[in-house]
Swiss-Prot record:
InterPro entries: Elp3/MiaA/NifB-like_rSAM (IPR006638), Methylthiotransferase (IPR005839), Methylthiotransferase_CS (IPR020612), Methylthiotransferase_N (IPR013848), Methylthiotransferase_N_sf (IPR038135), NA-bd_OB-fold (IPR012340), Ribosomal_uS12_MeSTrfase_RimO (IPR005840), rSAM (IPR007197)
Name under which the protein is recorded: Ribosomal protein uS12 methylthiotransferase RimO
Example GO biological process: tRNA modification
Major enzyme class: transferase
Lineage: Bacteria, Pseudomonadati, Thermodesulfobacteriota, Desulfuromonadia, Geobacterales
Length: 447
């Protein structure tokens, strides 16, 4: 009898929050009798961790599943497993349309992945495990960080209790629930012990952290406790809803040296009629005042936001207001999404749906405007000094190192190309910025 471990490969789609879920499953499997591989061709078991937030994400998930189903026919793979938001939302349809899939697992059953695979050995039929989405990771579970060792995402809460009219997340992930403070700190210490220099805090809305816990510890309290961990250099804040940003949080970002002077601030729109239809809690004056206050208190802060164009009822006037705001507010980074009409949401039933053609036109105009803004913002950094974490060699040439400044989040922002000086992967060095493009920087190591 062979004692060889079965090999498992994971494909994780969607946002960093999904990636952490995938890492939880990999950690559970690695702790059991499975070997993890990044090569699907040599895997006995392939898991696709899916996203279904918007139409494009759903299509990417389906395309990936079908592609891997073909590989299952041709290769050594014996089990194809689909996990995450897509089966949580569409279990009946998927089971009917994708007979190639052996197991579907929803967002509440990640820790049971090893037991689920074991159960399949005695049950030849297609299996579905779609329970209530109430899972919350804690430090007693093993998580296999798939990012480079020097950086990690740290999920501080699960779910969402906001009721944005376009969003399906609450139905897929459940109500907002914070992890206990000590649980978050214990995982952070473990990540740092494993080599992490940078920790990126994530949740559906990090500003809500702690309000549901005994004693209601604030996000500021969590940040200060994290900053006390020896060996941790950077703390980055992602997904901070504007209505939850307090003066205390602004002062913590300003005064705590380990906190990156960077804030991801998803505003979605600026026109009050659209914000109201979206069921967002912020208004145009409040958003404008917040951006001004952040820039006044922390002049060197890098601000990122995300916007939706083509929301039902968005008029030309609404869009012009948004376009002018993007030009005025001068966000350093900006992501734009065309509104996706998601069944089961209030927005899907609203009148005055905007055509796909108009959505694409508005998307292009907004991205063109932001390219000009980003170019201008980056030019201002020439001849300044930036801290940069070194990530390896450029894809174009091994003569050029690359990295990210504290103003650039992993995966979603630009890079810094290093033209002079030597450093190791994971080092944090000081660079003098010598040139820039729309989204990237170029510099030389000075220390």
């Amino acid at each position: 009898m062979s004692n060889a471990k079965e090999k498992v490969s994971m494909v994780s789609l969607g946002c960093p929050k999904n990636l952490v879920d995938a890492e939880v499953m990999l950690g559970r499997l690695a702790k059991d009798r499975y070997e993890i591989t990044t090569d699907e061709r040599e895997a006995d078991i392939i898991i696709v961790n899916t996203c279904s937030f918007i139409k494009e994400a759903k299509q990417e998930s389906i395309d990936t599943i079908l592609d891997l189903a073909d590989r299952k026919q041709d290769g050594r793979c014996r089990l194809l497993i689909v996990t995450g938001c897509l089966p949580q939302r569409y279990q009946e349809e998927l089971a009917r349309e994708l007979p190639e899939v052996d197991i579907f697992v929803g967002t509440g059953d990640y820790p049971r992945i090893a037991e689920i695979i074991e159960e399949k050995s005695s049950r030849p039929e297609q299996l579905r495990y779609i329970g209530d989405p109430n899972f919350v990771f804690d430090e007693s579970l093993t998580r296999l960080n798939s990012s480079p060792a020097y950086t990690a995402y740290l999920k501080i809460a699960e779910g969402c209790s906001n009721c944005c009219s376009y969003c399906v997340i609450p139905s897929l992930r459940g109500a907002f629930r914070s992890r206990p403070l000590e649980s978050v700190l214990a995982e952070a210490r473990s990540l740092v012990a494993g080599g992490a220099r940078e920790i990126n805090l994530i949740a559906q809305d990090i500003t809500t952290y702690g309000r549901d816990l005994p004693g209601a510890p604030s996000l500021e309290t969590l940040i200060r406790e994290l900053a006390a961990i020896d060996g941790l250099a950077w703390i980055r804040l992602l997904y901070a809803y504007p209505d939850g940003i307090t003066d205390g949080l602004i002062q913590t970002i300003k005064n705590e040296p380990k906190v990156c002077k960077y804030l991801d601030l998803p505003i979605q729109h600026i026109s009050d009629p659209i914000l109201k239809r979206m069921n967002r809690r912020s208004t145009e004056p409040q958003i404008r005042e917040l951006v001004a206050r952040l820039r006044e208190e922390i002049p060197d802060i890098a601000l990122r936001t995300s916007l939706i164009v083509g929301f039902p009822g968005e008029t030309e006037e609404d869009f012009r207001t948004l376009l002018h705001f993007v030009e005025e507010a001068q966000f350093d980074r900006l992501g734009v999404f065309c509104y996706s009409r998601e069944e089961g949401t209030p927005a899907a039933e609203m009148p005055d749906q905007v055509s796909e053609r108009v959505k694409r036109e508005r998307y292009k105009k907004l991205m063109k405007a932001q390219a000009r803004v980003s170019f201008k913002r980056n030019r201002r950094l020439i001849d300044t000094e930036e801290q940069v974490i070194v990530e390896g060699y450029s894809e174009e040439t091994e003569l050029l190192l690359k990295g990210r400044s504290s103003r650039q989040a992993p995966d979603i922002d630009g890079q810094v190309y290093i033209t002079a000086g030597n450093a190791n992967v994971g080092d944090i060095v000081r660079l003098r910025i010598t040139d820039s493009s729309d989204y990237d920087l170029i510099g030389e190591i000075i220390s």
